[in-house]
């Protein structure tokens, strides 16, 4: 039986296969990746060889043509290993779908096979030093010059920024557009493009193995053939795809909560104080029961939400709810679980310490939780 009611036998087998792969290729190396502050490209290649990169891509472009249920399995199993594997989810479920949905035939043939094989690692560059949630006010510009665009600007906090070979860059192609969001376009910038440089690898509180960087564009010459979709339609494309991004973040937070509860249950059953397991104390029991209840509610909410998403329903309000509530819940659970671990929970050798520092950023990226509440309020007519 699968984890979700929509899982069939093939999804269960796929999960087992992926878990076995990760137990061999990721778990033994994860601590070293955290120290190196980078996941090697060789791991991406292995993912591609096994069919775990963008399996939803159509077979004619090298993919397996699988449905979103497989993406759920991959996302969950990556998070189960550690949150620093979030870059795989960004590649599979966030960036590559833009090429699939809005790219033309030539672009699909040029880029998708590499995205599936691991020869390409993708990133999406929205955030700037002066523009995060306020996406319409980005300052990176792209000016048409014959068969090219000349791009100038800076991006920051870019997931997969160091390893990336393809970066989907959000640019202003019409700075005078009113309202401002009507002047935004999407350009695919390839590694090695003149005028494109990668900045420093940012030193984050958590997600140490996940490469996050600044990107610079100085008179960067990007072929007009790299425009994704239509000029000045970029904001619309982003709004259409951000729902899946937020769903992916919510799923990862749910898995993190499940993982933290599981490790804490194991700990309180074996750790003794005053001659008996600390799990026998009423305070510990109440805390763990409360966590288990929230996690069960989160699972049911996600299950329904994933089904609605696959059915093509409008999930904007509900996915915003899931994103803010599940990430906030995971943050709270991380603190409770660390407390139940006592002093050992503050030691790096215990996984709860890593979870404690990795989870907070989930409430910030993919649209801050405050923005999620604003979206919900507007759709409630407030």
What do the predicted segments below correspond to?
Residues 1-81, 85, 102-107, 114-119, ...:
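Alpha-helical interface subdomain recognition
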Residues 66, 134-136, 160-165, 179-183, ...:
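Short glycine/proline-enriched turns and hinge-like loops at secondary-structure junctions
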Residues 118-126, 168-170:
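A short, Trp-centered hydrophobic/proline-enriched beta-strand micro-motif
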Residues 148, 152-198:
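A short core secondary-structure module
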Residues 51, 74-79, 170-172, 188-194, ...:
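Short Ser/Thr-interspersed hydrophobic loop/turn segments at strand-loop and sheet-helix junctions
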Residues 88, 115, 130-133, 157-160, ...:
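Short Gly/Pro-enriched turn/cap motifs at secondary-structure boundaries
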Residues 215-237:
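Long, acidic (Asp/Glu-rich), low-complexity accessory segments flanking structured domains
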Residues 137, 192-223:
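Flexible, small-/acidic-enriched active-site or ligand-binding loops
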């Amino acid at each position: 039986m699968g984890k979700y009611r929509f899982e069939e036998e093939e999804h269960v087998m796929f999960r087992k296969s992926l878990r076995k792969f990760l137990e061999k290729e990721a778990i033994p190396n994860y601590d070293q990746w955290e120290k190196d502050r980078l996941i090697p490209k060789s791991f991406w290649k292995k993912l591609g060889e096994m069919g775990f990169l963008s399996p939803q891509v159509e077979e004619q472009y090298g993919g397996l043509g699988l449905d979103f249920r497989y993406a759920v399995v991959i996302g969950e199993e990556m998070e189960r290993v550690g949150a620093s594997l979030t870059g795989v989810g960004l590649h599979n479920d966030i960036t590559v779908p833009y090429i699939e949905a809005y790219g033309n035939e030539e672009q699909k043939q040029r880029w998708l096979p590499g995205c599936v094989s691991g020869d390409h690692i993708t990133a999406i560059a929205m955030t700037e030093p002066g523009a995060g949630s306020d996406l319409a006010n980005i300052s990176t510009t792209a000016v048409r010059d014959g068969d090219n665009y000349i791009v100038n600007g800076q991006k920051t906090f870019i997931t997969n920024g160091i390893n990336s070979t393809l970066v989907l860059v959000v640019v202003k192609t019409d700075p005078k557009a009113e309202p401002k969001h009507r002047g935004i376009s999407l350009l695919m910038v390839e590694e090695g493009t003149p005028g494109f440089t990668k900045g420093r690898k940012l030193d984050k509180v958590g997600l140490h193995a996940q490469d996050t960087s600044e990107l610079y564009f100085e008179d960067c010459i990007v072929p007009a053939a790299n425009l994704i979709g239509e000029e000045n339609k970029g904001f619309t494309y982003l709004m259409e795809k951000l729902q899946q991004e937020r769903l992916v973040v919510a799923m990862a937070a749910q898995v993190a909560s499940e993982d933290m509860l599981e490790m804490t249950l194991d700990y309180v059953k074996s750790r003794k104080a005053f001659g008996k397991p600390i799990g026998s104390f009423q305070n510990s029991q109440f805390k763990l029961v409360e966590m288990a209840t929230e996690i069960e509610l989160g699972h049911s909410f996600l299950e329904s939400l994933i089904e609605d998403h696959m059915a093509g329903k409008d999930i904007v309000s509900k996915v915003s709810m899931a994103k803010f509530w599940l990430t906030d819940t995971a943050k709270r659970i991380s603190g409770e679980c660390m407390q139940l671990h006592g002093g050992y929970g503050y030691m790096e050798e215990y996984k709860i310490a890593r979870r404690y520092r990795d989870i907070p950023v989930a409430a910030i990226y993919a649209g801050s939780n405050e923005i999620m509440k604003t979206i919900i309020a507007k759709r409630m007519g407030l």
